[in-house]
Amino acid sequence: MHPVLPTGIGVLVGPMIGVVLVTHGRLADEFKAATEHVVGPQAAFRTVCIGPQDDMEARRDDILSAIKSVDSGQGVILLTDMFGGTPSNLAISALESGKIEVIAGVNLPMLIKLASVRSTAKMQEAVDKAQEAGRKYIRVASKELTGG
C-alpha cells in the first residue's frame, strides 16, 4: 500500500506522480503559485530555487529531499526552466529510469496538464502529455490571428 499524501489544506489524496520544479531564481515558486491559481492546491508538488551564489551540492541535496517528499511510488517528474542550465544539470543528476524523469523548458500549460493527469496516468504517459501540452500552447499571436 502506498502512503496517503497531505495536500497542505487538510485533504488527503492517494498515490500520484510527484512533481518537483527546479529553476533559476524564484521562478519555480512563481510557477507553482500560478499552477495553483488555475487548478487549485497541489499535493506532492515541491519547488527548488537555484540562486547564483548557492552551494550547488546543497541545492542537489534539496532536490533529492524534494524527490523523497513527493514520491508515493508512482514516480517523480522534475521540471526545469532550461536544458543545459545549472538547475537542469542538477535535476538530471537525479534521473532514474522509470522512476525519476526530467523535462526541461517548463511552461504553465505543461504544469496544468500534469496536474490533471498525474493521479491516474503512468509515468511515460504523463511525461508525453506534459510535453505535448507545453508545445501545443507556444504560439505567435500575429500568425494565429492572420492564419500565416
Located regions from the model:
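N-terminal loops that bind phosphate or other acidic moieties
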Residues: H2-G148
